[in-house]
Amino acid sequence: ALLWALNAFFQGWGAPVCARLLTTWYSRNERGGWWAIWNTAHNVGGALIPMVVGAAALHYGWRTGMMIAGGLAILAGLFLCWRLRDRPQTVGLPEVGDWRHDEMEIAQQQEGAGLTRKEILTKYVLLNPYIWLLSLCYVLVYVVRAAINDWGNLYMSETLGVDLVTANSAVTMFELGGFIGALVAGWGSDKLFNGNRGPMNLIFAAGILLSVGSLWLMPFASYVMQAACFFTTGFFVFGPQMLIGMAAAECSHKEAAGAATGFVGLFAYLGASLSGWPLARVIDVWHWSGFFAVIAIAAGISALLLLPFLNAQAPRALNEA
């Protein structure tokens, strides 16, 4: 148990650091697409690693499989340490906002000049109401995401009477939809809303509510239609799952992008934990109607929490709330 906890602890270091690099090297009006591509890494890795490690474990034992996974992670980390630089100025380049003539990026670069790291963390993360709104929204989005991932195959088995393999294949469509949805959300927030994540977040949150409602209120006896519903739900869930983290980085101080992303990420995993035992109790008492009611309510409230972000977002500090 201790080793698993340490494994998760060190894995958690990756995302905030990547968020900091993405906010440093890409400007506001292009960041969504690149952030979306980075966000698909866990989908691609989640698909490839079981095949690579599974084959190694089958032929050489489970210890070898785990060592291969760890070895690949170490090699990738060493390569990144060798090739990555913390900011453009390190290699003699101007700040990315100046290079791209991005007004909102320039505003974020100039925000809070001269503050200490403690003042930045306090003002732009811990006491920033917009970060707290995004954190609460992340809890609800992850309730929906983890609920479909954890309970979707059981729902398919009980409602359609299909075997577990067939049920899991439908849940796979949820991940596939999420892969595409994250790319569309990132690209759309750049091209359609000029780097404002609020409108796209709200559109996708409304889509979560509609797609969850289609699974709940219009149950299809056809496996194909159920799989299509899982696909659309994944498409809309993974948009906010990606955009909320990026919005947190952009609503904070540029020097606190990693801290802001890590802070909202903490609440995301709180939401994932709520889809375990608490949701199991809901299913025991109110069955699948209760299950879908809970995640539909979560989707609806998440949409309401995103309403303050409809306007274009410069850095948000406490005194702007």
Short names for language-model regions:
Residues 38, 42-91:
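Helix-loop-helix hairpin linking two adjacent transmembrane segments in secondary transporters
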Residues 191-205:
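Cytoplasmic membrane-interface "Motif A"-like loop-to-helix N-cap segments
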Residues 206-220:
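C-terminal ends and interior cores of transmembrane alpha-helices
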Residues 3-43:
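Cytoplasmic helix-loop-helix junction between adjacent transmembrane helices
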Residues 91-133:
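Juxtamembrane intracellular "pre-TM" segments in multi-pass secondary transporters
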Residues 183-195, 283-284:
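Helix-to-loop junctions at the C-terminal end of transmembrane segments
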Residues 254-285:
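A late C-terminal transmembrane helix in Major Facilitator Superfamily
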Residues 128-183, 241, 275-276:
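Extracytoplasmic gate region of multi-pass secondary transporters
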